[in-house]
């Protein structure tokens, strides 16, 4: 009955890398839709997170998944867990 499958209790978010200019850090823009409480219209809300990128492998435009972790620095408490979709090169 008791399966030994472990699931992570850490929060995960999916967003787009908007900056990779810092060493071992990327800035990830996470957007989500929220219904306005009075008017009922869906509005796009966004927030930027600094995430740890140990190998400097992610580029601007990549769609990545970030996972909550212990604080790495003053502004970093997230780490990039995987690449969802690479940026298109035009």
Swiss-Prot record:
The keyword Ribonucleoprotein is assigned to this record: yes
Gene3D superfamilies referenced in this protein's UniProt entry, alphabetically: Nucleic acid-binding proteins (2.40.50.140)
Pfam families: Ribosomal_S17
CDD domains tied to this protein: Ribosomal_uS17 (cd00364)
Classification via SUPFAM superfamilies: Nucleic acid-binding proteins
Matching PROSITE patterns: RIBOSOMAL_S17
UniProt GO cellular component terms: cytosolic small ribosomal subunit
UniProt key word Ribonucleoprotein: yes
Keywords: Ribonucleoprotein, Ribosomal protein, RNA-binding, rRNA-binding
Function: One of the primary rRNA binding proteins, it binds specifically to the 5'-end of 16S ribosomal RNA.
Protein name (Swiss-Prot/TrEMBL): Small ribosomal subunit protein uS17
Provenance organism: Burkholderia thailandensis (strain ATCC 700388 / DSM 13276 / CCUG 48851 / CIP 106301 / E264)
Originating gene: rpsQ
């Amino acid at each position: 009955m008791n399966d030994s499958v472990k699931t992570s209790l850490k929060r995960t978010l999916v967003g787009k890398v908007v900056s990779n200019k810092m060493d071992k850090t990327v800035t990830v823009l996470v957007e989500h839709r929220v219904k306005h409480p009075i008017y009922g219209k869906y509005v796009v809300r966004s927030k930027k997170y600094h995430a740890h990128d140990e190998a400097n492998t992610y580029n601007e435009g990549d769609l990545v998944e970030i996972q909550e972790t212990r604080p790495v620095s003053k502004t970093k408490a997230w780490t990039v867990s995987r690449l969802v979709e690479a940026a298109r090169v035009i």
